[in-house]
Amino acid sequence: MRVGCGYDSHRWAAKRKLILGGVEIPHEFGLTGHSDADALTHAICDALLGAISEGDIGFQFPDSDPAYSGISSLKLLSKILEMVDKKGFAIDYIDSTVIMERPKLMPYIPDMKSKIAGVLKMPSDRINIKAKTNEGMGFVGRQEGVAVFAVALVKENQD
């Protein structure tokens, strides 16, 4: 078994959609980014890439490449699943924490889990998403952006 850790953060931006875990969440702001700026999916991508020793999302899908401009992060996650499979691993479990002051995410978490599970071809009960605030501290507390941590556990395929 291997473990990978992922982290991502994005600034708030006007005139952008807020997408987390592939789910569009109604909010007055979205997140800045070259892709759809889905910080949750990006952190999960980084955790999976770390677990299979393949760098990070910026290395695999550089923001200097116009092919990734505005791309759905779920498409990137799908490509990473192919890499996991090719390296001889299977995803066992994902745990993540989204840190933002608002909006409240609890109503959207089941849909996020379902979308991520669908892309990763795994049961949604093997994906955990927690939502926390930063109690008014730091850049998250000042509502300048969001931060996400993720951990992925992968195991070698037993062929």
Swiss-Prot record:
SUPFAM superfamilies reported for this sequence: IpsF-like (SSF69765)
Q: Which UniProt keywords apply?
A: Isoprene biosynthesis, Lyase, Metal-binding
A Pfam cross-reference name: YgbB
Cofactor binding note? Binds 1 divalent metal cation per subunit.
Q: List the Gene3D superfamilies.
A: 2-C-methyl-D-erythritol 2,4-cyclodiphosphate synthase
Q: Which PROSITE patterns match?
A: ISPF
- What GO molecular function annotations does the UniProt record carry, in alphabetical order? 2-C-methyl-D-erythritol 2,4-cyclodiphosphate synthase activity; metal ion binding
Residues annotated as binding a divalent metal cation are D8, H10, H42
List, alphabetically, the InterPro entries matched: MECDP_synthase, MECDP_synthase_CS, MECDP_synthase_sf
Q: Which cofactor does it need?
A: a divalent metal cation
Q: Which reaction does it catalyse?
A: 4-CDP-2-C-methyl-D-erythritol 2-phosphate = 2-C-methyl-D-erythritol 2,4-cyclic diphosphate + CMP
Q: What is its EC number?
A: 4.6.1.12
The pathway noted for it is: Isoprenoid biosynthesis; isopentenyl diphosphate biosynthesis via DXP pathway; isopentenyl diphosphate from 1-deoxy-D-xylulose 5-phosphate: step 4/6
- HAMAP family noted in UniProt: IspF (MF_00107)
How is this protein organized at the quaternary level? Homotrimer.
Query: Belongs to which family?
Result: Belongs to the IspF family.
Q: What is the name of the protein in this document?
A: 2-C-methyl-D-erythritol 2,4-cyclodiphosphate synthase
